[in-house]
Amino acid sequence: MKHKRTRLRMDRVLLLAGSVLLLLFLAVMAVCAVFFSDTGPRPTAAGQGSDTTRNQAGKTQRVSVTATGDILLEEPLLNTFGSGSWQDCLADIDPLLAADDLTIANMEVPIGGEELGITGIDYSFNAPARTAQNLKDHSIEFVSLANNHAADRGTQGILNTRRNLDEAEIGHTGTFGSQEERNQTNVVTVNGMDIAIVSWTYDTNQPYDQEWQVNSFYSPDSAQSQVLLEDVRRARSQADAVIVCMHWGTEFTYGLNDAQRILGPQIAQAGADVIIGNHPHTIQPAEWIETDGRKTLCLWSLGNFLSSAYQVDRADETFQDMYEVGALAAFDLVPGASGVRVENTRIIPIVNHFEGEYESFRLMKLKDYTEELAAAHSQRRFSDLFTKDWLVQQVHEVFDPSGIELELD
């Protein structure tokens, strides 16, 4: 009996030791899953998804998103940076972009590379191939490509842009390499959430070879506008959240045009959670559009993100000044029992600062700008309006009616 009891005690010791080792193994595996999993944006097979009502029960992680205005690489910026990096031009903004889960920008110019000729004047643009890597260096993970400059270098420019972005691992949509690709939904997965991103423009400055190469809606009553809405409905059925990037509106005005007034509510009705507008080269209002008990965040225009021009000849004094001011929109996509909600929304006004004949480029938050810097800005030589106080006043007048938090203090 004594021998049997000893053996049983040994069995218990071995069982206990085995249990401890198993628990340690499971703990190590859990830690590895947290620290070595890729929670950044991952493209998924286009067109994948479930039915219209997606189950959010198992999804608890929110996704923080930052949207920017137009990246417009005009001649002074190209002369400063050449085919190299953007240096420390975005140093004041970088921490904000690095801290989010997903940054979406409007890439206003083709990234066709040196072989197609680098230009930033006469409203015909083309950027160096290195630009795609610059986007990645500054934590921009996704770009909208449907805009009026998409075809500035024709079909080859469209193809080169897509190739350069692919090589830099930057997600993109709005221009396409085939009809089949055009008919698919672009979905990125971030923190386990499937986010569909749709991109359309009112038109392009230059013609392109095939209708499927660029998403262009032309007018709010066109057949292509119905294709746009069908894209949004399809995206709604294939993703947890839907973001629609629209290149629309009238340049150099705070007011909305007919295309915005008509299509905005229709896009919301079709299933967009967020609408990101660009093209007017100035900020425009933001609002919540309510349809069928749903609320869609609509940012009519975020203005310029990165640009370099003073005394823009097509604008009056107000919008020559406001050409230098844009906004970042930050928001969280939060899963819930009835679908994704948009929360923690805020608008961060920014200033493109440069001095003299396009020197000392610096992108800054307006809240950190000073009257001394405003006095040194190149635009101040032509406009006494260009003061920090006046810029802040304009931003308040545009965004305050939305009730969205404005980061100015």
Feature-to-residue mapping (PLM):
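Acidic, metal/ion-coordinating pockets
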Residues: 2, 10-409
